[in-house]
Amino acid sequence: MRKGFPAFEWWADPPQEVLVRMYVFNVTNYDEFMNGSQTKIHLQEVGPYIFREKIEHKDIRLNENGTLTYTTKRRAVFEPDLNTLSLNASLNVPNLALLGMTSYLSGASFFVKFAFNLVVRKMDMQPLVKISVYDYLWNNSNSLLTFASKMVPNMIPVDNLGVLHMIYRTYEDEVTVFIGPNNTKRFFTMDMYNGKNRFGYWSNMTCDSVKLATEGVLYHQEVSKEDKLHFFRKNLCRVTPLYFANETVNLGMSTYRYVLPLDTFHRPKDGSHDCYTLPGDKPHPDGLSEISPCFYDFPMVASLPHFLAVDPAVRNQVDGMQPDEEKHSGYVTIEPNTGLPLESKAGMQCNLVVKNVDGYSPVKSFSNTYIPIFWLQLHQVGIPQYLVSMMYFVVVVLPNVQGVVSALLVVLGTSLLAIGVFRFQRKATKAVYSYISLDTVPSSI
């Protein structure tokens, strides 16, 4: 991995091959739920809205200890040519500011709840609101959020709850990875993240360590079927494991497919402490993973899309979930010699955590529920053709050429040896005949 080589140049200025497919959930029974005739909200998936994730690597420097330090920045750009849906369409969605703040204050004193209820009534805040798709993704604010961010900035550090805005607002981090020849199995795994050997999300080092984590742009060389890969995505707030599933053929090359286990977000089976749980909180049901430290402490959990592999009791809190393992699970296809991912898909759903909010009359019907907000799919659709050609030559053509050349050299060597032996025998035979002819010449004495 050196400057000037194709692999380095491709990584330093990566082609924009990652598509972000956004799916949002529209509440279709707004009136029935609000008047109490129906007890569960019905959600309809709307999407995809397709963006291209632009990745920039800057401030790149090679370190003397065999590591590489760089700053990675990501942003999402709307792709008009790939979209058939309008960002101006209207949605009925949960009022994230109201529900999130009441959930945050669920354990507050009576006086705090009373004061908050007065503010909510004065502002005529409703638990469900109508909003455009664009504003829901990028510019989701209201008078309650603006008021709270000014009055208690430590509790409400943002004044915009647009879901993509929250994901990409601070997506710029310094990463140090191993690249030296002595770090083959740790190639492009993290050594430091923002100058530390931990992410800073969790108190337990087991969950917070950067060791073996990778951003998924490159994996180590000579990947084996026994290897467990470690994928880190900032908005997931944790490292997730990938395990070998099967061999495949991709772009004419033999590849390995690694998958994300469906029980990744389950609680430990041995009953040990779940270090992805916030202090003072109870563990979430199986299939849910705490991500609020990565969303400004906003009460959020991640799951697989449509509550795939989530505790059925959680899925039954809302109507409209249609989990599909083939559509909603994640994988990465890797060329094992180089560790280069040729294709990958990863799906993640963000869900609002509403705790016991019985003390807040406008939202008490949402108490103790997990409300799906959106799910997104990250899809690396391939790699540039010049890189495909180079890889194909290295992993397919060159080994075969080497085999043919080796065989030709063996044949040539054997032929030369045979010719040499033949010539030697021929000379030896001529010499014997010469001596015999001398013996038959009559003596002149």
Question: Where does each model-flagged region fall?
Answer:
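Extracellular or lumenal secretory-pathway regions
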Residues: 1-254, 260-445
